[in-house]
Amino acid sequence: MSKQQKILFIDRDGTLIVEPPVDFQVDRLDKLKLEPFVIPSLLSLQDAGYRLVMVTNQDGLGTDSYPQEDFDAPHNMMMEIFESQGVKFDDVLICPHFEKDNCSCRKPKLGLVKEYLQAGKVDFQNSFVIGDRQTDLQLAENMAIRGIQYNPEIMGWKRILKDLTVKARVAEVVRTTKETDIKVFVNLDEQGGNAISTGLGFFDHMLDQIATHGGFQMVCKVEGDLHIDDHHTVEDTALALGQALKEALGDKRGIGRFGFSLPMDECLAQCALDLSGRPYLKFDAQFSREQVGDLSTEMVVHFFRSLTDTLACTLHLSSAGNNDHHIIESLFKAFGRTLRQAIKVEGTELPSSKGVL
């Protein structure tokens, strides 16, 4: 196992399999029962990049009160079921002692997981202990990672899967220079509630087109040196927006990555987008006026160039028509509609054969 892996340290009885309420021992095959949705959830968690390690206390295992052979039959059957369905545990760590034995390996002590901690195998920000008991949460605290208390009613495997794989795709970027003071917030999984104020009415409208057609929420407040011109305001807003979108996308796991759009009004706007991690812009649009509203038409291409720089995307964008207002609006709409396709979550895989975007 390479260093710094996302690892789930998972309890067995009461978390992976049902714990018998009378004697708390799964010592016969007829007592073996999987917790609801555990297999599809573990498969999806594996697909999301998590490694699985089982960590379990088995009181008195190997003694007369809990003979090894009584444990082995249902345990081996459980492992065979998991393996047959594609669920792979990197390790199965078992403490066989009673609490009174005061051993160093019984949860919540660190003996069982000591090797993982000392070898630097654990990604502390993205690893978890999952178990049904307070001792599991205490183990997580002792390991300096987060704990999830399993409960089939309120925190079952479906909920755990959602919490660990569907992360909030939000970001806020504050950018302050001598020319501008900008705050941009985006939420890629919410729509509506856009609040955009740049001091340029037409530019506000264009940014709203990106968010509305992109299917995400944008809050953008800009104070710039408009007494000079609109250059710094437009450029720095684009840089901040691109950075916010990039941060909200995270590692881009599961997204569509690509988008294509050809909307038709009296203008033909074409847009192709690849969230490739590499900035490149090919822009083709001609304007007959110096301004539309309070926005300089020369700043349209500059906006998209600055945006591609911080978003780190490949963008081909063009529009042709007779009305500059409609041409510009079609560019922003087409980009928003294309971005909607590219940021949509379609699965859990990283959309790159290189393993990174």
Curated annotation (Swiss-Prot):
Lineage, uppermost ranks: Bacteria, Pseudomonadati, Pseudomonadota, Gammaproteobacteria, Vibrionales
Entry annotation: catalytic residues: 11 (nucleophile), 13 (proton donor)
CC terms in the record's Gene Ontology section: cytoplasm
Associated pathway: Amino-acid biosynthesis; L-histidine biosynthesis; L-histidine from 5-phospho-alpha-D-ribose 1-diphosphate: step 6/9; Amino-acid biosynthesis; L-histidine biosynthesis; L-histidine from 5-phospho-alpha-D-ribose 1-diphosphate: step 8/9
Protein name: Histidine biosynthesis bifunctional protein HisB
Similarity comment: family membership: In the N-terminal section; belongs to the histidinol-phosphatase family.
Binding site for Mg(2+): 11, 13, 132
Entry's Gene Ontology molecular function annotations: histidinol-phosphatase activity; imidazoleglycerol-phosphate dehydratase activity; metal ion binding
Sites where the protein binds Zn(2+): 95, 97, 103, 105
Domain of life: Bacteria
EC number: 3.1.3.15, 4.2.1.19
Alphabetized InterPro entries for the sequence: HAD-like_sf, HAD-SF_hydro_IIIA, HAD_sf, His_synth_bifunc_HisB, HisB_N, Histidinol-phos, IGPD_sf, ImidazoleglycerolP_deHydtase
Reaction catalysed by this enzyme: D-erythro-1-(imidazol-4-yl)glycerol 3-phosphate = 3-(imidazol-4-yl)-2-oxopropyl phosphate + H2O; L-histidinol phosphate + H2O = L-histidinol + phosphate
Species name: Vibrio vulnificus (strain CMCP6)
